[in-house]
């Protein structure tokens, strides 16, 4: 399952995914995220919450690349990834991030990630 939200007032894209993410769902996440990026101003932040991911299809990495290419074209500033106990998903996303030339800050809870992005820690 997933949820994608453009927080226009905070200039932030929030992507939450949890459970088993198959190829079709990964494509829907990509479509939803790419579809709302244009609602954000340049220098937006991206918060991805993976802490509830239990299984991740390889298509998720293809969609991560797609989302980040759209984010780069729009002009993102920072990425914070909430990993919780989803170590496998975190490692796979981190490898892809490095291949794309950016580093994501890691957080262990949504609250910690929001504090980081809001400038409080």
Language model regions located:
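Amphipathic, Lys/Arg-enriched alpha-helical "gate/interface" segment within cytosolic domains
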Residues: 1-121
């Amino acid at each position: 399952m997933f949820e994608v939200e453009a927080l226009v007032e905070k200039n932030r894209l929030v992507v939450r995914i949890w459970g088993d993410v198959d190829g079709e769902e990964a494509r829907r996440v990509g479509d939803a995220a790419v579809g709302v990026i244009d609602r954000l101003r340049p220098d937006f932040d991206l918060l991805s919450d993976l802490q509830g991911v239990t299984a991740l299809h390889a298509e998720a990495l293809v969609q991560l690349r797609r989302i980040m290419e759209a984010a780069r074209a729009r002009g993102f500033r920072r990425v914070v990834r909430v990993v919780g106990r989803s170590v496998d998903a975190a490692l796979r996303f981190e490898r892809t991030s490095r291949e794309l030339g950016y580093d994501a800050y890691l957080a262990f809870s949504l609250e910690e990630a929001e504090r980081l992005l809001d400038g409080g820690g």
